[in-house]
Amino acid sequence: MKHKSFQLANQRIAPGSRHSVKIPAARLYNDTPMDLHAEVFHGVKPGPRLLVCAAIHGDELNGIEVCRRLMGELDPLQLAGTVIIVPIVNVFGFIQQSRYLPDRRDLNRCFPGSERGALGSRLAHLFNESLVQNATHIIDLHTGAIHRSNLPQIRVDTDNGDALEMAEAFGTPVILHSKERDGSLRSLASELGIPLILYEAGEALRFDYAAIKAGVTGVQNVMKSLKMLKGRRSRKKVKPVVAHRSAWIRNEYDGLVVPKVELGQTINKGQVVAQTVNPHGDDLHAIKSPYHGIVIGISNIPVANEGEALFNVAQFDGERIEHASENVDVFVEAYDQKPI
């Protein structure tokens, strides 16, 4: 069967070709146009339409580099289906190196958006109408917030079978069961019946090269599982373990924080994970973990007030934690921090 052209924003992309599509989004104060830039790879055979997007939060840079590297490796002549890559969704936040839009709204709480709403609502509406509704599958790339690092992980509603299959194919050490939040892209995709997985890795405004390499390989693994690319999944693979809950360990005392555990480490209930100390004295206070699990998120600021979040711990059922711990070890061996 002859493969048809793909149409996006009134532009037709022929089978076996790559095309840059710029969708007018808004204008800056000085009348400079702002576009949503999508790179489209339209394969020679019919198949799924995969949307890969990054920087819905404008300061989350790892996903942008994942997209850039992915674009350098994709060949539409070897592709079944269509890949739509949007490296920067929140163009306003990216320019300002900010998570948010100029009006301090979170774009990932504005979906599905409105043509006549506030800026965030309008941008969400444009992204939805132009790109989301053209996709059959979505991979949304994120990082931790400023001064917080995340262990590479997939967040997904594990009750969605198609999305769970994508999550397992991606190949992170941990899959975290996570329900959708109102106004998020995940919530919109769920309403539209589009399976979506969210990749969390690294810290805002920083490149984490292990996370970037794992992201590129993970997207390609998903494409292979969807029969968009030929070949087997990367040998650098783990069988992810699902954590159905996670919780933050919070500081109980004001002062300087001296961590005793690191990202990806398995910890036991009652284990000392940090100590706080008064900067004017020698009083040490131990912070003990109320959970048994794996550290999947960590605060990088060694100063904290009472109640501030320090460590995010994924919790597992039964013997799964041993499997998850092995996955972390395999992952660390497979991906290094070298830029290339």
Features from the language model and the residues they span:
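Structured catalytic-domain cores with a bias toward divalent-metal coordination
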Residues: 1-340
